[in-house]
């Protein structure tokens, strides 16, 4: 981020189009190739046939020839390797894709926005809220939570919709023209864009850039949904008796008479409280309501029309299924390399009146998030942070890095896990995962300095150095959309998903 700020200070007049020149900066491809903003990667200009080394000159030629008429010679699909040019096409395409990911994430990072003078100070969520929910869903208690709508986010998505959606948030026309060319050349990389089979946004074959595009697309979908939800209270109907003179409401009125024949003369109370609770996980999302299924049916058609009209994505009614939420239901989520287990608990509250001595029992349904300690330990064991029993071990492959980089990597993973699971009411499992990562970090540092853990702790003030493992973070590095000039856009642009959870490294590819 320091390199980006220095670049902007050199030429402040080009801040609107600063993304395009970054495409030709050497350190961008070094950062993208290393997948770590804290790692110093050298630019290698020899052995271009190797899959582990690359030439910056060839990367620049690829970008330049994308504008030329003969660029199809560079991206021919007849073989994996272009014998005429002598380099691996897919390898350099991967580098360009990762570089685009690094560049396009810059204007959406919290650190970059806070560095601008006119940036708006945005407070982070409190300690009792987790990051996988836009609205209060997991952490709140509801007296009546009866119906759940399981929504499958539609795909494939047209490439032009992706480019226009990303261009609307960051005004850098030259960069997005280059991005459009790149997407059309490599649209067959990702099943999310071209094929209609089950989406797998976190597959190892998917580049980091397409993960960003997918989350950005879902983010746009959720931001519009958030806008509709905020304004739905102005559209609610307190009584249908005021609508008798309107002809186009007769059909709805007749339908309601059939369903609610006995209560037709009364005010329909479920229109007064359009409470919708939302959470997204993997390629799906959930809408939950404590009202009758009629409200979810209305939102069902809202979303279908939204996808068809705004995103040009054809969606059928089967993509949204409404079902009744029972007490034995349990939800299992897997997103971003993390697993959540949400159970619906039924509790009874007993109260007693003072004057009249009789008990009153009120049943309440409560959703609690649970930290899945066993799957997390398996994930840590797979990433070589501990053994299968959960005993911390050192990370030998990281001993070549500096002490600061080693600690930063462990802290980043620990921070992301904390962001995801700290909404749970029971944090004992979360503290155990933090302990494993903390001790694994100490063992890795001791192994690097060829010392024992006890001797290393005596020589170094570990309490001051590693205190972040045990403290809750007050500020969250999140993805914030800048406020648009339009009043309409400012109504629904909110903090709705987090960028830092994508960089969980070894835990990211958990299966």
Curated annotation (Swiss-Prot):
Gene that this polypeptide is encoded by: matK
Main location class: plastid
Superkingdom to which the source organism belongs: Eukaryota
Keyword Chloroplast carried by entry: yes
Signal peptide: none
Subcellular location: Plastid, Chloroplast
UniProt cross-references to Pfam families, sorted A to Z: Intron_maturas2, MatK_N
Gene Ontology terms describing biological process: mRNA processing; RNA splicing; tRNA processing
Protein name: Maturase K
Taxonomic classification: Eukaryota, Viridiplantae, Streptophyta, Embryophyta, Tracheophyta
Gene Ontology cellular component terms for the protein in this record: chloroplast
């Amino acid at each position: 981020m320091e390199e980006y700020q220095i670049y902007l200070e050199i030429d402040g007049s080009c801040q609107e189009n600063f993304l395009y020149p970054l495409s030709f900066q050497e350190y961008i491809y070094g950062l993208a190739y290393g997948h770590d903003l804290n790692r110093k990667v050298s630019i290698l200009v020899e052995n271009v046939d190797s899959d582990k080394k690359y030439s910056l000159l060839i990367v620049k030629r690829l970008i330049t020839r994308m504008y030329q008429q003969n660029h199809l010679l560079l991206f021919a699909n007849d073989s994996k390797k272009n014998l005429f040019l002598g380099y691996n096409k897919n390898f350099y395409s991967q580098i360009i894709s990762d570089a685009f990911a690094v560049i396009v994430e810059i204007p959406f990072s919290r650190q970059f926005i806070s560095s601008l003078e006119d940036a708006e100070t945005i407070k982070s969520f409190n300690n009792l809220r987790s990051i996988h929910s836009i609205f209060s869903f997991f952490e709140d208690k509801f007296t009546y939570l009866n119906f759940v709508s399981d929504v499958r986010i539609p795909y494939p998505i047209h490439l032009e919709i992706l480019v226009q959606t990303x261009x609307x948030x960051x005004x850098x026309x030259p960069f997005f023209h280059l991005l459009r060319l790149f997407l059309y050349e490599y649209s067959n990389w990702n099943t999310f864009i071209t094929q209609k089979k089950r989406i797998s946004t976190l597959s190892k074959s998917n580049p980091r850039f397409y993960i960003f595009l997918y989350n950005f697309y879902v983010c746009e979908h959720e931001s519009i949904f958030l806008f509709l939800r905020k304004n739905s209270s102005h559209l609610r109907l307190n009584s249908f008796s005021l609508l008798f003179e309107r002809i186009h409401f007769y059909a709805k009125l007749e339908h309601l008479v059939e369903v609610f024949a006995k209560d037709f003369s009364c005010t329909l109370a479920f229109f007064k409280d359009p409470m919708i609770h939302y959470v997204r996980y993997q390629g799906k999302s959930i809408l939950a309501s404590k009202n009758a299924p009629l409200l979810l049916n209305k939102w069902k058609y809202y979303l279908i029309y939204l996808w068809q009209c705004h995103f040009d994505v054809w969606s059928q009614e089967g993509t949204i299924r409404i079902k009744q939420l029972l007490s034995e239901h349990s939800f299992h989520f897997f997103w971003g390399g993390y697993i959540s287990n949400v159970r619906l608990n039924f509790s009874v509250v007993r109260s007693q009146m003072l004057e009249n001595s009789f008990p009153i029992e009120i049943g309440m349904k409560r959703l609690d998030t649970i930290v899945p300690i066993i799957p997390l330990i398996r994930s840590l064991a797979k990433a070589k942070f501990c053994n299968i029993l959960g005993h911390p071990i050192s990370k030998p492959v990281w001993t070549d890095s500096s002490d600061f980089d080693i600690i930063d990597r462990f802290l980043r993973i620990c921070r992301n896990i904390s962001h995801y699971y700290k909404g749970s009411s029971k944090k004992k499992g979360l503290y155990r995962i933090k302990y494993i990562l903390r001790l694994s970090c100490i063992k890795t540092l001791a192994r690097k300095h060829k010392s024992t853990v006890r001797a290393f702790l005596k020589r170094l003030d570990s309490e001051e150095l590693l205190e972040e493992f045990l403290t809750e973070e007050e500020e969250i590095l999140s993805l914030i959309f800048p406020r648009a000039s339009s009043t309409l856009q400012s109504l629904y642009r909110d903090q709705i998903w987090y960028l830092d959870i994508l960089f969980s490294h070894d835990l990211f590819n958990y299966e």
